[in-house]
Amino acid sequence: MTTAVLDLDFNQLPPVITGLEGYSYALILIRLARRPVGQVRLPVIDGEISGLELRHALIETADAAFWKHWMYHQLGWEQANPTGAASPTATVAVCTRDRPDDVRRCLETLMRLPDDGQEILVVDNCPSTDATKRIVQEFSRVRYVVEPRPGLNNARNRALVEARHDVIAFADDDASPDPGWLRALLRNYDHPLTLCVNGLTMPLELETEAQALFERYISFMRGFEYKVFDEAFRNPLSVGRCGVGANMSVRRSLLTCVGPFDEALDVGTPTRSGGDNEMFARILAAGYRIIYDPAALSWHRHRTSMAELQRQLHGYGIGNFATWTHHLFIDGELGALKEAGLAIDRRLEELSASLRREPNRIPLNIITAILLGYALGPWAYALSRRRFRTRSWRL
């Protein structure tokens, strides 16, 4: 049951959307003056979607964020950078490991960004071949460095050290940033306490069952409302609302303000994930700001096969409990025990629904993979802490 992913402007909605033969549904991103303001999911009938049906669905599903964007647009107000201060210059960092084809697609997209003097840096993490290096050599504007120690957070820290500009915008190698992505991120750095700005992540495609399941069950989408997280947002266990590492930017001074990314967390280590959320929690605990701006849009290509999805969500399960282990034993956050218990309860409810074969259930193998990840998470974090002794990263 494939889903078409469409991108339409609110003021230019067509009377009918055609050419959707072979699709059962369409996920439609709605923009207003190029800014993402909402999304609608509609069934496809005979390869078409009625424009009238789309308009009705949009009005019915429009939330407060949509109408806020609409009013800002009508009044000609800007939601970010109200001071008019000049935006900083950025280094766009692509951290990758043995995925040269993804790197090529990502770099081709980055070449279409407006040239505002940004640097593009590929950090090749513990590569097994020189395939990625050879791909990068095809792009004269791209700089290539190797981080020999495995782990995404090692690669992120290497990017912070190597960057030549004040802000580092991280783009996943399987992502395709929108042309306005970088400018939208950078215009939010007008306040000195803003240490991190994250953007909206939408699915690039939903062509397979695995991709559709990921978007329905996990999703990187954090909504269409512009948000500022600061000292008033004190729950380090709810930082997932701040954004995702697939569409994240930070000041280079992060290293001196709050320290490097935790090398014991995320892809390439036994913990498999969690590095972004741990950093978000640390930034807020230190009294700095995180901004979520949905205008900073990036399209992400989800895993295409169920086997890949199962491995990914198993890793997310490990990473969740590894991060909560960090919060409990390193930060002294007793609330991590409550969060872990709630997560287990939710998965057990989903397991029960799967066993009863309820409609729209999560496949049994996915639920069991996540639960197994939960069980392994604390041990994975302990192993990772012993294996990866944090280096002294300096600017």
Show the residue positions of the predicted features.
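A conserved acidic beta->alpha catalytic loop
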Residues: 109, 124-133, 175
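N-proximal low-complexity "stem/linker" segments adjacent to membrane-targeting elements
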Residues: 2-24, 28-33, 38-39, 44-109
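Non-catalytic, C-terminal membrane-associated alpha-helical segments of glycosyltransferases
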Residues: 314-318, 332-395
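Short, acidic, metal-binding catalytic loop of nucleotide-sugar glycosyltransferases
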Residues: 108-117
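Short aromatic/hydrophobic "clamp" motif used to bind/position activated sugar donors
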Residues: 168
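Conserved donor NDP-sugar-binding/catalytic core segment of glycosyltransferases
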Residues: 180-217
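A short, conserved alpha-helix in the catalytic core of glycosyltransferases
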Residues: 242-259, 264-296
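Short, flexible, basic/aromatic active-site loop/helix in glycosyltransferases
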Residues: 199, 218-240
